A protein has these predicted regions:
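Phosphate/nucleotide-binding beta-alpha loop and adjacent structural elements of enzyme active sites
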Residues: 2-208
């Protein structure tokens, strides 16, 4: 970690760690953010990733990780579900807005639909990605909307009180395979991001 921080600071032109910078990096580490992937990138890529860091919206810098793995690829294709607002905490906003990527966002929570449409230009699907297509499932929209989830998975992140207070409604499901066919996704995806508050395994279980 020290080596990585020193490389980052070198790109920023620092030879001594400022207290504010040290506090920022320490806070990132305390929240589980891993910068280990930066140890493997070239100096030129590192400089670009450092420049992009303030633009990153992803909670754990997943967008920067993807760029580092794909050589700062432009024009890639992503699939992300649950997309929420499409910007805050988004793993793909940076890829679309600054690297010309296209893709598919899936988000069944009604509270996000208006903001998602305003924030993104890619394909947006409001069905709930699940292991099968055409089912009607109960959905919980919590007071903290980032934690919205399918009924039956609320125990993952919601307290009993928060679950009881959640707005409930039915959502229509689509399998991952059918979602890709529906929107004519390419045969090879550059990045698949899944954040569904507990139902990830069910989504991928029958995906071939």
């Amino acid at each position: 970690m020290k080596h990585i921080i020193n490389r980052i600071l070198g790109q920023l032109g620092y030879s001594v760690i400022r207290n504010s910078k040290l506090a920022s990096l320490s806070a990132a580490a305390a929240h589980g953010r891993s910068w280990d992937f930066l140890a493997e990138v070239t100096s030129a890529q590192l400089a670009e990733l450092v420049r992009l860091n303030p633009l990153s919206q992803a909670q754990l810098k997943q967008d920067l990780f993807v760029l580092s793995e794909l050589g700062l690829k432009r024009g890639g294709f992503f699939v992300e579900f649950g997309a929420a607002s499409g910007k805050e905490l988004s793993n793909t906003w940076l890829l679309e807005k600054h690297f010309g990527w296209s893709g598919i966002l899936a988000e069944p929570a009604r509270c996000w639909h208006e903001r998602l449409a305003a924030n993104r230009s890619c394909i947006i699907d409001h069905d709930c990605v699940w292991r099968s297509t055409g089912a009607q499932l109960g959905f919980l929209e919590a007071a903290q909307p980032e934690l919205a989830t399918l009924d039956g998975f609320q125990h993952v992140n919601l307290s009993e009180k928060a679950s009881a207070a959640a707005v409930r409604y039915q959502v229509k499901t689509v399998s991952l395979a059918d979602l890709l066919v529906r929107h004519h996704a390419p045969a090879e995806l550059d990045y698949l991001s899944i954040d569904t508050e507990g139902s990830e395994y069910e989504i991928l279980r029958d995906f071939d």
